[in-house]
Amino acid sequence: MKILMRADTHVSYSVPAEGTKANFTFSQVLAALSVSLCSLVVGFVSAYTSPALVSMTDRTITSFEVTKDAGSWVGGIMPLAALAGGITGGPLIEYLGRRNTILATAVPFIVSSLLIACAVNVIMILCGRFLTGFCVGIASLSLPVYLGETLQPEVRGTLGLLPTALGNIGILVCYVAGSFMNWSILAFLGAALPVPFLILMIIIPETPRWFVNRGQEERARKALKWLRGKEADVEPELKDLMQSQAEADSQATRNTCLELFKRINLKPLSISLGLMFFQQFSGINAVIFYTVQIFKDAGSTIDSNLCTIIVGIVNFFATFMGIILIDRLGRKILLYVSDIAMILTLSILGGFFYCKAHGPDVSHLGWLPLSCFVIYILGFSLGFGPIPWLMMGEILPAKIRGPAASVVTAFNWFCTFVVTKTFQDLTVAMGPHGAFWLFGVVCIVGLFFVIIYVPETRGKSLEEIERKMMGRVPISAVVNIKPFSFNM
């Protein structure tokens, strides 16, 4: 989670791995920042229930009763609504455009938070949370698609991780504010956060790719000029966009479902689905769930609110590292580091909790789970947290990008709901040690998935990625690891 700005009209960014300097305009930074402010809102509303439920269930603060069951739905309804939003968002970004779809979530975000803040019963809170989740689902797929289609290849990774950075800032703001605000005042704060994002989104243009898709060549040229700078020669890029669109049109069918499941499109779709699966089943919910217990085992007297704030700080620091490294090392290297860190820490955490339950005595090793916790969060936030979303906007073919992103986003939120709802049952059946080890095995499978199937997209234009993904030439190569061929 970092952004580089200067007072003049351009920002210079050097990519050492390529040995060249890539210049990109301040406009691209502004575009990335504008849509990333939406991610800040997403982070805030996603974290809302964690601090809010404490005061919401306190009858001395809340004028109406919020039962334990109702409280679980206040937290659990958002992933279901986000799933619905993900399904809806695909058609919206195709028909309204990427920018307009993101912009359209601003007012509902404000309304949903006001609905919660002014609630006089649980139904109003649930309606507000459902509307919030619906907008989160739409934003989840719209942001990476917009950034993927507007940013230059040399900085697409760096600026493409900006939504994750601001999303983690939103989570941190919610945790800190929630430590001294009750649920109603916290919701009023949530209603104010979309205002800057609403204002800035009006300034930035639609993506050139969407204009080309609509046959609006002149508007695409103007959008490219805005993004690349008035003095930039955008004709080669525009020509490449139009050629790519012509190729896509020549192969397209009218049936979207049939188009999605063509052999030529299954490869990028399955890679994106796989990354989302391994993201959600990597054990992140298990580790977060046991945060307070891990701190207690380390002999800490830190209260639960401060624990969540520490999680937010570690999250932010890791994503900040990712922003610095992603366009230098590439996506796959960060995924390798992320996966290996999670495998090791989940294995050790499983062993610690097993020994705690069955012996020998490990009370003197309280520092061990705490160290594993920090390393795990760092690893997840460095790779498997943000990169699946970034790559979704990079590898999905243009002709199916809307519906495919919709499927992938809905699948992600479905996995989130399944993991959240079944995790406690899993720990009862297997014990916490069994749950940690199971997630560790999933991460091992995920590592081989990345090695074999996931392509390296660093420094490549979307058109280049698409052509190579559609062909038989694998673009998945990192250091001296040669990928297996994957022809579908």
Curated annotation (Swiss-Prot):
Extracellular compartment residues: 50-72, 127-129, 182-184, 290-305, 354-372, 424-433
UniProt xrefs under PROSITE patterns: MFS, SUGAR_TRANSPORT_1, SUGAR_TRANSPORT_2
Residues spanning the membrane: 29-49, 73-93, 106-126, 130-150, 161-181, 185-205, 269-289, 306-326, 333-353, 373-393, 403-423, 434-454
Keyword Transmembrane carried by entry: yes
InterPro entries named in the record: MFS_dom, MFS_ERD6/Tret1-like, MFS_sugar_transport-like, MFS_trans_sf, MFS_Trehalose_Transporter, Sugar/inositol_transpt, Sugar_transporter_CS
Pfam families: Sugar_tr
Glycan attachment sites: N182
UniProt keyword list: Cell membrane, Glycoprotein, Membrane, Transmembrane, Transmembrane helix
Any one GO CC term of the record: plasma membrane
Compartment(s): Cell membrane
GO MF: sugar transmembrane transporter activity
Domain of life: Eukaryota
Membrane-side (Cytoplasmic) residue stretches: 1-28, 94-105, 151-160, 206-268, 327-332, 394-402, 455-488
Membrane topology annotation: Multi-pass membrane protein
Record-stated family: Belongs to the major facilitator superfamily. Sugar transporter (TC 2.A.1.1) family. Trehalose transporter subfamily.
Annotated function: Fails to transport trehalose.
Name assigned to this protein: Facilitated trehalose transporter Tret1-2 homolog
Name of the gene: Tret1-2
